[in-house]
Amino acid sequence: MNRIILNHLNFNYQEIYFYWFQHSMKEQYSPLVPSKQSKEMWFTNSKKYDSKIVSKFNVLYEISDNRKHITRIDKTINFMISTYQKLVPVFNQKKDAYYQFGNLFTYYNDRMLRIYQTNKYYDIIKESKKDLIQNLRKYHYENFRKFLELTPNYEVIYHKLKDYTEINFHISFDDLFFDLFFCKHIILTNIILYDQFSRIIKRNTKESYKYDYVTKTFSEKLMELDIRHLIYLFTPTEFMFLMLPFQHYEDKTLDTVFLALQNTENYEKEFKLKHRNFVYYSKKNNYADFFKELSYHNRGHYDVLSRFGRYPKRNQIMGRLSTPDENTYIRLTPNIPY
């Protein structure tokens, strides 16, 4: 597993992750809900990328376009999910098991800060990338500290899981959680790369939709995890990017876009239970409005697919003839992108 992670742990992916949140979403190393102004800037910037940036990510996009790479990512996802499924029963009998599971991640995130400073992983970073990696550590450290509820019980859980893992899996428990931590971000970064950058770099071409099935598959696999675990693994903004492939994939059966509706509803419910009203309705991060807007777009995609069986605004790019009903829809909805 370490070998797989090291193969993926190139700093292009980390750069994608942070470039996207810093420059596109206008949220510098923060999982906060974007403001109205941020959204307006995002819609503007998504159409006006600096030529140097487009060129840079275009090369990266082409390099990443190979089946071997996709297969490795797929194996990584499967490993992460199977590991969760095996580990959870060990401490699932406790009433506050999910909180302790989160606390364990907090503990390992804290360990990661020390590992990065002394471990060989840090030594391979070029001088020009050190600030980026420090921001990576800073972002996730602050993220976990903010979103997890701490208890003093993690030591007991840690030793119990450690013994179980090393006896049954024959691998280092420390390495396992270090790997799992990066699994999450590698997967999310790939979803952003294939789902979002493809649409910007290959705008108005068939290529922009080339990886919709791939990103949809990645998101489906992550949704196999318990929704209560996803609360700890992904902030609402990150979760939104997991839902976008479900919106984008043209599925006549409506099963895929329905997953976006269902998963968003479940995530919001668990998020509200975990953080109570103080966080959910706070003025600084009004997650109530955030989930409302995400659900609105989920429903919008669902309604369009249920009505036409496809997205009419892709017809011209895909070389498809539009029906009279579709032409009417396209004419009457100039501000709706789907």
Please provide the spans of the model-predicted regions:
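Intrinsically disordered, low-complexity activation-like regions
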Residues: 2-338
